[in-house]
Amino acid sequence: MQIWVDADACPKAVKEILFKTAMRREVKLTLVANQYMNIPTSPFIDTIKVGAGFDVADNEIVKLCNAGDLVITADIPLADKIVEKGATGLNPRGELYTEDNIKGILSMRNLMEELRSAGTVSGGPAAFSPKDKQNFTNQLDKFLTRSLNRI
C-alpha cells in the first residue's frame, strides 16, 4: 500500500499531515509534481518531478498507482481513473473517492463545469478551512487503519 499525492495543487497543510503520517505509520508516500517539492528527509517519502504540461502528473500517477493504494487529489477526472485501477482517492477536504461514488461525483463536476461555462453559476469551492483539515486527517487515519490491518 502506497500513498500518491497530486502535489502541485495540494495545500501545504495537507502535505504536512501526510509527511507526519508517512513517518509515524511507516507508509510509502510519493509526491508527483511538475515543480521541485521540498520534503523532509525520510526513507518513506520521495518525489517524482514530471515535465510541465496538461495532465502530465496525473498520467504518471495513473501509470504508477496500484489497487489498494491511496491517491490524494482534488482532481475528479484523475480520481475516476485511479478508482478504475482499484485505488482509492481522497481529496484535501476529506472526501473519499470510491467505486461506489466516483461516477456520481464526476457527473456533478461535469454539470457544474457546464453551468459555469454558460454563466449560470459562478465561483468555485470555499477556501480551505480548519474543518477541512480535520476532515482530511480523520479520513486518512480511518483509511490507513483499515488498509494496514488487512496486511
UniProtKB/Swiss-Prot annotation:
CDD domains: PIN_YqxD-like. Pfam families: DUF188 (PF02639). It comes from the Bacteria. InterPro entries: UPF0178. Belongs to the UPF0178 family. PANTHER family: UPF0178 PROTEIN YAII. This is UPF0178 protein Desal_2673. It comes from Maridesulfovibrio salexigens (strain ATCC 14822 / DSM 2638 / NCIMB 8403 / VKM B-1763) (Desulfovibrio salexigens).
